[in-house]
Amino acid sequence: TTMRKAFILSECEPPECDEKPYALLVANPTKGHHFIAQTEQRQNAFNLQVNPQNRNVYQWPLSRFDHHPRGEINSVNIEKNLEVNNLYTLTFVEGDGGQQYNLETWFSRHETGYEEACESLKLLAPGKQLANPELHRILNLKILGLLRNPLTHRDYLVRELTGALNRHLPQTGTEFRELIARRPQERVSRILKEFDFTLPGYTDWLADLYGMLSEGVFRPSLFARLTAALTTDPNQIRLILHRYPRGHRYCFFADSGYCLQADNTMLSIGFNIAADMFLILQITRSHWHNLSNLLSETPPPAPQTPLTVMDNQHQQRLTFNRLCIRQAHHAVYGKSNQLSDFL
C-alpha cells in the first residue's frame, strides 16, 4: 500500500533509503509534546531575566472573563504548558529506555528560527510592502499549528483545511492503525477523553499529520504545497501585521492558536506572533475552497504576498484579544496578569 511504502521508521531497504532520505523518522526520547511550540510561547513570556527553559506566561482561565469573574490567573511554566505526553507518538522502541518514534523532529524543522524571524519583523517599515521570507516562515508554523492542535480538530476552519489535504492523502493503512493500537491503551484513552477523539479519529489525525509532513508520501511534502498554495495568488490573499512597540499593551494567545472573523466573501485568521505583535491572514473564500485543487502541483516560486504593517492600532488589538477569549477552549495566555494591559 502507499502508506506502507511511505511509513519508514528507520531501518529501510537500500533502494528506499536512497530515494527517500527525508521520509525517515528518527527515534528520540522526547515524550512531552507541545501543540503550541515553546518558541512561540516564549515570545509572550514575562520573566525574561531567567534562562529560556524556565520562562513563564500568565494563564487566564476563561472564567476570568465571566460577568462574575472566577478562578485564578496563574503563572505557568512554558516547558509544561500546552503539551501532552506522547500526543504525537507513533510507536515506542521496544526495550530501549523511553525511545520513541514521533513527529517531533519534523515539527522542529518548522519551529527553528522563529525567534530570529520575530526580531526581523520589528525592523520592517510601516506601510505596504511584500512579505519577507521570515514572515512566511512564521505563517507556515501558524498553519502547522492549526493542523496539529488537538483542541481544534473539530473546528470548522480546521476541518475544511484537513478536508483539502485528505483528498490527496492515501487511506490510513492497517499498518498505521496497528501501530497506534499497540500503544499503551490507558495513556491513549486519556488523550481521547481530553480532546474528544475516537480511537479511529485520533489514528486518522496522526496519519494525516504524518502523511502531509512526510517527503516519502509527496515531494515536496503536501504541507509545503499547502503553504505555497495559500499564498500563491496575491489577488486572493493579504497579510496585515499589527505591532505595538510602545510597551504594556499586549496581545493574548488562545489555547486554540488562532482566532477567526469570517463573512460571505472573506476569512480573516488572526495569529499571536509575540506579546506585542499579531498577524492577520486575509483570504478569499473562493481561494480557500479551491486550495485542494492546487495541491497536486509543485509549489510555484517564492510568493509575492502583499503585506501591510501597522503600528499602535489599539482598536484592532482589543478586537483580536476579545476574539481570542471568545474562541479559546479553556484559557488564553499572555505577558501580564493585569486586564488593562489587554483590554
Each model region followed by its residue ranges:
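Alpha-helical structural context detector biased toward long hydrophobic helices
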Residues: M3-G32, I36-L343
